[in-house]
UniProtKB/Swiss-Prot annotation:
Involved in urease metallocenter assembly. Binds nickel. Probably functions as a nickel donor during metallocenter assembly. Keywords: Chaperone, Cytoplasm, Nickel. This is Urease accessory protein UreE. GO terms for cellular component: cytoplasm. InterPro entries: UreE (IPR012406), UreE_C_dom (IPR007864), UreE_N (IPR004029), UreE_N_sf (IPR036118). The keyword Nucleotide-binding does not apply. It is found in: Cytoplasm. Its main location: cytoplasm. Disulfide bonds: none annotated. It comes from Acinetobacter baumannii (strain ACICU).
């Protein structure tokens, strides 16, 4: 079994690669097993540096390259009569820290009947659909720099 251990920022245009479709849940993990479309089993033991986004490349130590694509999965799709109503739904779902995928005409989240009822209560339409899930990463994703000289901490006399 090939074990993929490296994340690649980019590959050369002539680089050969295979592809694998993974759910959002799997793409959040640094260690997983999966099967290629050909049925070949692969494994991953990647650095813990964030989510594998659709279109990401990973490689084995031997140089085999694999493109990771978002696999269609069961999601709740929120649509509205107006853009403002869709914005309100995004606000309410965001307040619940739900992984949320935004498009100009719809919101998508993982199945949750309580959230679906809440959104329907706001007057929006919720349907189930199969769609690749690529939620927003959030304001603090990949956020790892030092705040020791942050003006906000200095202003409020916060000590680390």
């Amino acid at each position: 079994m090939k074990i993929y251990t490296q994340r690649l920022e980019d590959i050369s245009p002539d680089q050969a690669f295979e592809t694998v479709e993974l759910t959002f849940d799997t793409r959040q993990k640094s260690r997983f097993r999966a099967a290629l479309a050909s049925g070949v089993d692969i494994g991953a033991d990647l650095p813990r540096t964030g989510i594998l986004r659709s279109g990401s490349y990973i490689a084995t130590q031997e140089g085999d390259v694999l493109r990771v694509d978002a696999k269609p999965e069961r999601l709740m799709k929120v649509t509205a009569q107006t853009e403002f109503d869709l914005l309100k739904a995004a606000y309410h779902l965001g307040n619940r820290h739900v992984p949320l995928m935004l498009t100009p005409t719809a919101l998508y989240f993982e199945p949750d009947h309580v959230l679906a009822e809440m959104v329907e209560g706001l007057g929006l339409t919720v349907t189930e659909t199969d769609h690749p899930f690529e939620p927003e990463s959030g304001a603090y994703a990949q956020h790892s720099h030092d705040h020791r000289l942050s003006p906000i901490k200095v202003l409020h006399h916060v000590h680390s």
